[in-house]
């Protein structure tokens, strides 16, 4: 499992990088689950990491606004993100999801075809009036995206495991692989979740709170990053 860690600034990015993260993910928790940070923060993080890890950037929790989303995705790509990640929040239909991801993918790939698009659904999709993550792999593959993810939409301390069980998450990762996509699991994950995550076998796990001592509003701690890296490699 690759480890994606989500700092909010250059200082945290350096800690995540030194601690051994595989992917450094720039987000802004003040603006939501996949809240977007500023272009200059992405550039600063890119410079601080200096090629040691690829950079991911979230562009927001999006409802059906393909124009706005594609422009945001283009901005993240230009700012230096290697992975551009969008959340499908309050997406009502599969057709809406397909158009949103297709337009984002076109915006990113027209600029640089080596950059990857990550489409994220939400384990608590019923709470946020969106589509099931299990529908996402086939839609994302059709749209030309590279990675599908499941996260929690509402950050109230509840974990992805409170909304999707092990079998559902295994189905999600399996569907992703059948569609030729990488997959990722995130959403208030804890150290005690690692054994079940190993059984599920996602390509990537995404964390913030776990390496902030359990509170995602605190700062990332290098010793917790190193502990997580060691446990993932054990």
Curated annotation (Swiss-Prot):
Keywords: Lyase, Schiff base. It comes from the Archaea. InterPro entries: 4HFCP_synth (IPR007565), 4HFCP_synth_arc (IPR035081). One of its GO terms (biological process) is methanofuran biosynthetic process. It catalyses: 2 D-glyceraldehyde 3-phosphate = 4-(hydroxymethyl)-2-furancarboxaldehyde phosphate + phosphate + 2 H2O. GO terms for molecular function: carbon-carbon lyase activity. The active site is at residues 27, 85. Its EC number is 4.2.3.153. Pathway: Cofactor biosynthesis; methanofuran biosynthesis. Catalyzes the formation of 4-(hydroxymethyl)-2-furancarboxaldehyde phosphate (4-HFC-P) from two molecules of glyceraldehyde-3-P (GA-3-P). Belongs to the MfnB family. This is (5-formylfuran-3-yl)methyl phosphate synthase. The gene is mfnB.
